[in-house]
């Protein structure tokens, strides 16, 4: 029996994650590939690199809801590359090399919708595995929102666009305070 069927309430943080994802989608939809190849201020990543990174970790967030084993099967090859001294970009390349920037943008958006759907219907207190310490589903989707918002800001900055934030970013502020010592 699903969480919502036994009286659970939808996880509002999932909807907030989707708001930040949607603002990025609306900023980039219809742009040509040259925009996705622009270098951001973050480690010389391109806008396309950012979407690749967000996509990979959206997939990881869905895999961990399925099971710890699914997460490990997906994430361990990335972790091995990181432990061998590779960068995140180098570690994620094998997963993304079959997509051009525009295809990657579209699958990132689809993965964002999937994260929202899966986490909306998950018990917020469910404990799930991650690369760092285990966390609640609520913390996991808030971390996805935080990463989407933060990497999104580098895209807004690079394109000279103004972002209109709202109260939904309070989740990010709470997460920052709660994890400051960690």
What are these regions (language model features)?
Residues 1-12, 59-116, 120:
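Short, helix-capping/interhelical loops that line the mouth of catalytic, cofactor-
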Residues 1-2, 24-26, 35-38, 88-93, ...:
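Short amphipathic alpha-helical segments, especially helix-boundary/capping motifs
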Residues 2-52, 61-63:
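An N-terminal domain-cap segment
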Residues 14-18, 51, 101-105, 109, ...:
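Generic detection of long, well-ordered alpha-helical segments
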Residues 22, 55-56, 113:
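Solvent-exposed alpha-helix faces
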Residues 36-81, 130-182:
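Short, contiguous alpha-helical
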Residues 93-160:
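Contiguous mid-protein beta-loop-alpha structural module that forms a pocket-lining wall or clamp
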């Amino acid at each position: 029996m699903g969480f919502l069927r036994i009286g659970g309430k939808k996880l509002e943080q999932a909807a907030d994650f989707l708001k930040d994802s949607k603002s990025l989608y609306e900023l980039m939809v219809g742009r040509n590939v040259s925009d996705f190849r622009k270098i951001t201020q973050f480690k010389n990543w391109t806008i396309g690199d950012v979407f690749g990174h967000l996509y990979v970790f959206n997939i990881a967030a869905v895999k961990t809801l399925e099971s710890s084993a699914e997460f490990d099967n997906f994430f361990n090859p990335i972790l091995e590359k990181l432990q061998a001294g590779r960068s995140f970009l180098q570690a994620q390349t094998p997963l993304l090399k079959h997509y051009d920037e525009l295809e990657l943008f579209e699958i990132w958006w689809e993965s964002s919708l999937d994260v929202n759907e899966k986490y909306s219907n998950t018990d917020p207190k469910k404990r799930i595995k991650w690369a760092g310490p285990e966390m609640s589903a609520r913390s996991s989707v808030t971390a996805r929102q935080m990463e989407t918002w933060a990497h999104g800001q580098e895209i807004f900055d690079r394109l000279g666009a103004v972002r209109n934030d709202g109260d939904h970013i309070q989740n990010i502020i709470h997460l920052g305070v709660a994890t400051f010592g960690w």
